[in-house]
From Swiss-Prot:
One of its GO terms (molecular function) is aspartic-type endopeptidase activity. This protein specifically catalyzes the removal of signal peptides from prolipoproteins. Pfam families: Peptidase_A8. GO terms for cellular component: plasma membrane. It is found in: Cell inner membrane. The lineage of its organism: Bacteria, Pseudomonadati, Pseudomonadota, Gammaproteobacteria, Enterobacterales. The active site is at D123, D141. This is Lipoprotein signal peptidase. PROSITE patterns: SPASE_II. It comes from Enterobacter sp. (strain 638). It is a multi-pass membrane protein. Keywords: Aspartyl protease, Cell inner membrane, Cell membrane, Hydrolase, Membrane, Protease, Transmembrane, Transmembrane helix. It is an enzyme of class 3 (hydrolase). Its EC number is 3.4.23.36. The gene is lspA. Pathway: Protein modification; lipoprotein biosynthesis (signal peptide cleavage).
Length: 166
C-alpha cells in the first residue's frame, strides 16, 4: 500500500522551499551590497556584518585546509536524506516534528548551497552585548536551531497516544 503525499510529513516540504528562498535571498543581498567585513548597525545589539565561514558552527574546522567543505557537505546531505525519510514515515498530522524537520532541511540546504557554490557559508547576523559578540550567523543557522529546539520541545510535550490510553 502506498501512502499519498498529503498523508505523510512530506506535505510540509513547502516550508523547506520558503526557508531556502528567504535564506538564499538574504545572502544574495549581502553579497551584492556588502564588502567582506562591512558592518551596518540595525538596532542596539544587532548588526548586519558580512563574514565568511569556511567551517561549521562557530567556525569549527574553518582553517583545516579545505577538506572540511566536502565533509560538511556530506553531513548536510545525509541529514537531509534521513529527515526526509522521517517525514515520509510520519503522518502529516504530526505538525511539530514535520515543521522542525522542514526547518532543519531548509537551513541545511541553504548552507550546503553556499558551501558548494562559494566554498564558504555567508554569515551576516551579528548579535552583541557591550563588547561581547556572539558568533556571526545566518538565517539558515536560525532555521536549523529553531527546528532542533522544536524537536527538543516535542520531547517534553505529552504524547497524544498516551493521553488516549489514560
Amino acid at each position: 500500500m502506498t501512502k499519498s503525499f498529503c498523508s505523510t510529513g512530506l506535505r510540509w516540504l513547502w516550508l523547506v522551499v520558503v526557508v531556502l528562498i528567504i535564506d538564499l535571498g538574504s545572502k544574495f543581498l549581502i553579497l551584492q551590497n556588502f564588502a567582506l567585513g562591512d558592518t551596518v548597525p540595525l538596532f542596539p545589539s544587532l548588526n548586519l556584518h558580512y563574514a565568511r565561514n569556511y567551517g561549521a558552527a562557530f567556525s569549527f574546522l574553518a582553517d583545516s585546509g579545505g577538506w572540511q567543505r566536502w565533509f560538511f557537505a556530506g553531513i548536510a546531505l545525509g541529514i537531509c536524506l534521513v529527515l526526509t525519510v522521517m517525514m515520509y514515515r510520519a503522518k502529516a498530522s504530526q505538525k511539530l516534528n514535520n515543521i522542525a524537520y522542514a526547518l532543519i532541511i531548509g537551513g541545511a540546504l541553504g548552507n550546503l548551497f553556499d558551501r558548494l557554490w562559494h566554498g564558504f557559508v555567508v554569515d551576516m547576523i551579528d548579535f552583541y552585548v557591550g563588547n561581547w559578540h556572539f558568533a556571526t550567523f545566518n538565517l539558515a543557522d536560525s532555521a536549523i536551531c529553531f527546528g532542533a529546539a522544536m524537536i527538543v520541545l516535542e520531547g517534553f510535550l505529552p504524547n497524544a497516544a498516551a493521553k488516549k490510553q489514560a
